[in-house]
From Swiss-Prot:
Disulfide bonds: none annotated. HAMAP family: UPF0251. InterPro entries: RNA_pol_sigma_r3/r4-like, UPF0251, WH-like_DNA-bd_sf. This is UPF0251 protein Ssed_3913. Belongs to the UPF0251 family. It comes from the Bacteria.
Length: 96
């Protein structure tokens, strides 16, 4: 049985719902879903340049979990860019 998921504090607002290649209708694209906590980790780690320890504390999670979320988010973004997929962003700010 997996451990219960810990509540994560999220603060970043998402400016749009999707990034996709120009000229290709979204119905024809493979979609990659970026979760809200992955978006927050990407924002804190790469945009705000916070250390993993500080960013993890802000989100209310362990440093290891933050690192895992950041790695997952980076992989999804890189895959979407290099393979021409649509990147679907979270739309509701929620505590999960």
């Amino acid at each position: 049985m997996p451990r219960p998921r810990k509540c994560r504090r999220l603060s970043a607002c998402v400016p749009c719902s999707m990034f996709k290649p120009n000229g290709i209708p979204s119905v024809e694209l493979t979609k990659i879903q970026l979760e809200a906590d992955e978006f927050e980790a990407l924002n804190l780690g790469d945009v705000e340049k916070m250390s993993q320890l500080d960013a993890a504390a802000r989100m209310g999670i362990s440093r290891q979990t933050f690192g895992n979320l950041l790695a997952s988010a980076r992989k999804k973004v890189a895959t979407a860019i290099t393979r021409g997929h649509a990147l679907v962003l979270p739309q509701e700010r929620q505590e999960s």
